[in-house]
């Protein structure tokens, strides 16, 4: 396994609360960086979305920790289960991005952040009630145009759209009536998305076709060797026929929709014996394609993927290559985000009430 920690400086910054999730916000200017955290205060059992600014070089000194300032917050009705940046649908682009917070009580809230006026939270929309989700909303993904898809432990799949002046409108795509549960979702096209949950199974849905999923990777391919839950899914914007998934026992695998019956296992259960040092053997909480790591492989191979795990590893996995370890923390890494505008920059939320920020060379 290749180690890269010595090639860049990692800044670990304590927080006053547990950080469930973290996402970069669009860069509104050359000087200011902003990010959102889903924070949980165990002392008073309250959860919030906090908007924070980051100055990577306070007072022009490159040798000091970045300066982080909390600018605004919004109190959630229950613990935040999914934090996402809601694209530009209905928002003001880089200056007024939207952030969505899904909750453990089954609601979805959309906040508009004014980065010009001190990151004030100007307004919010909500979708809630028993007709929306019953119980925890596990996964949310947005696409351009202000439309998202939500999945939950209740087995429901909803498509939600921001309607200016009216709030959120949603329609139910599927209701598993509690017999199935979904943990992750990702758009593949304006009409198609992929879901994942228990059993290392993935499902492709097409909004043009009602009812069941139009294709699926059955969850029994791992032959019951371990508990199997998909926690995160990502789809590369230029290769929408291939999605990547991360889950239990350090497992990261790809599903090529052109050959839907067999996964391409990159790490964990069923991985190639040529990989001597698996990146992780615990729960993989998040996966994202990493556009910053250059690959010279052919178009038939899987592009590099960044992952974080319960055993504190943040690293990069590429098909047929030894994994690269970026961070090895003494606690779980709950989530991470690669800055879309500056993909060398990565931010992580750590189990021990802190965040880690670094910029790759």
From Swiss-Prot:
* Cellular localisation: Nucleus envelope; Nucleus, Nuclear pore complex
Q: Which UniProt keywords apply?
A: mRNA transport, Nuclear pore complex, Nucleus, Protein transport, Repeat, Translocation, Transport, WD repeat
Example GO CC term: the record gives: nuclear pore
SUPFAM superfamilies assigned to the protein according to its UniProt record, in alphabetical order: Putative isomerase YbhE
Entry's Gene Ontology BP terms: mRNA transport; protein transport
Tell me where the WD repeats sit in this chain.
Answer: 132-173, 177-215, 225-265
Its primary localisation, in coarse terms, equals nucleus
Identify the stretch(es) annotated as Disordered.
51-73
Which InterPro entries does the record cross-reference, listed alphabetically? WD40/YVTN_repeat-like_dom_sf
Assembly and interaction partners: Part of the nuclear pore complex (NPC). The NPC has an eight-fold symmetrical structure comprising a central transport channel and two rings, the cytoplasmic and nuclear rings, to which eight filaments are attached. The cytoplasmic filaments have loose ends, while the nuclear filaments are joined in a distal ring, forming a nuclear basket. NPCs are highly dynamic in configuration and composition, and can be devided in 3 subcomplexes, the NUP62 subcomplex, the NUP107-160 subcomplex and the NUP93 subcomplex, containing approximately 30 different nucleoporin proteins.
Name the UniProt record assigns to this protein: Nuclear pore complex protein NUP43
| Organism, scientific name | Arabidopsis thaliana
């Amino acid at each position: 396994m290749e180690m890269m920690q010595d090639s860049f400086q990692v800044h670990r910054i304590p927080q006053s609360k547990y950080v469930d999730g973290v996402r970069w916000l669009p860069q509104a200017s050359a000087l200011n960086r902003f990010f959102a955290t889903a924070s949980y205060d165990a002392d008073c059992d309250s959860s919030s979305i906090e908007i924070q600014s980051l100055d990577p070089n306070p007072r022009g000194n490159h040798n000091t920790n970045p300066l982080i300032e909390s600018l605004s917050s919004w109190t959630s009705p229950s613990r935040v289960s999914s934090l996402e940046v809601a694209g530009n649908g209905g928002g003001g682009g880089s200056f007024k991005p939207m952030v969505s917070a899904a909750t453990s009580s089954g609601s979805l809230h959309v906040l508009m952040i004014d980065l010009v006026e001190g990151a004030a939270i100007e307004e919010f929309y909500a979708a809630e009630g028993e007709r929306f989700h019953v119980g925890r909303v596990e996964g949310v993904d947005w696409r351009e145009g202000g439309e998202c898809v939500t999945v939950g432990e209740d087995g429901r799949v909803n498509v939600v759209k921001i309607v200016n002046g009216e709030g959120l409108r949603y329609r139910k795509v599927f209701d598993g009536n509690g017999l199935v549960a979904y943990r992750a979702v990702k758009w593949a096209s304006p009409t198609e998305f992929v879901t994942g949950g228990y059993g290392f199974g993935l499902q492709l849905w097409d909004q043009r076709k009602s009812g069941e999923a139009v294709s699926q990777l059955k969850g029994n391919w791992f032959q019951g060797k371990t508990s199997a839950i998909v926690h995160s899914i990502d789809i590369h914007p230029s290769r929408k026929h291939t999605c990547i998934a991360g889950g239990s026992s350090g497992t990261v695998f790809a599903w090529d929709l052109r050959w839907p019956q067999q996964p391409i296992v990159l790490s964990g259960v069923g991985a190639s014996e040529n990989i001597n040092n698996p990146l992780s053997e615990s729960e993989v909480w998040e996966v994202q394609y990493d556009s910053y790591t250059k690959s010279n492989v052919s178009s038939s191979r899987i592009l590099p993927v960044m992952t974080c795990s319960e055993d504190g590893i943040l690293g990069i996995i590429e098909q047929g290559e030894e994994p690269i370890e970026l961070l090895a923390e003494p606690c779980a890494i709950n989530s991470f985000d690669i800055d879309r505008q500056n993909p060398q920059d990565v931010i992580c939320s750590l189990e021990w009430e802190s965040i880690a920020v670094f910029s790759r060379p």
